[in-house]
């Protein structure tokens, strides 16, 4: 595990790791206590400790979150060997100014009436915990790690891994 990071360092590290990931998996708890995950389109906004997603006001996830607001959001970038798991508290936000700030025309696939769509709402996740893995991603790194492990009997550099409270 890596060295302890300050709050600002942890937020900056996570922001860098999730910046280009276009789809995240949002996991909520159903009324039966089961975990339910679904893909969510990420928004082009700098991570500052909060995550934002557009959602339909009457989608099943909204009901689940109103009942049990603790959620997990997972980001995966296998090409770069980066993985992030964020936990926090979700809430539904109705804010037309924030909608306008975060809106992207590609979202019309889900909200045909655009910013005027009556179903349009924001889901805000206030992140309070994170765990991430940032491994060397090049083929050369993997070969060097393999050779190092064979020669020394010790595993190669697993990269950066940390659990942080935000």
Where do the language-model regions lie?
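A short, Trp-centered hydrophobic/proline-enriched beta-strand micro-motif
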Residues: 16-31, 71-75
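C-terminal edge-of-domain segments
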Residues: 2-3, 118-166
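Short, structured beta-strand-loop surface elements
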Residues: 64-127
């Amino acid at each position: 595990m890596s060295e302890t990071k300050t709050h600002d360092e942890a937020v900056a590290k996570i922001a860098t790791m999730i910046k280009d990931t276009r789809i995240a998996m949002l996991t909520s708890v159903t009324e039966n206590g089961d975990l339910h995950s679904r893909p969510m389109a990420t928004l082009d906004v700098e991570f500052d400790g909060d995550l934002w997603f557009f959602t339909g006001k009457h989608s099943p996830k909204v009901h689940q979150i109103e009942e049990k607001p603790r959620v997990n959001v997972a980001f995966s970038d296998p090409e770069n060997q980066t993985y992030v798991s964020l936990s926090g508290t979700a809430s539904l936000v109705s804010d037309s100014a924030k909608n306008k700030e975060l809106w992207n025309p590609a979202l019309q696939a889900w909200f045909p009436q655009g910013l005027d769509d009556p179903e349009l709402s924001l889901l805000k996740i206030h992140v309070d915990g994170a765990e991430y893995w940032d491994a060397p991603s090049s083929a050369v790194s993997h070969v060097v790690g393999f050779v190092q492990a064979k020669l020394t009997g010790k595993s190669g550099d697993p990269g950066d891994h940390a659990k942080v409270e935000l």
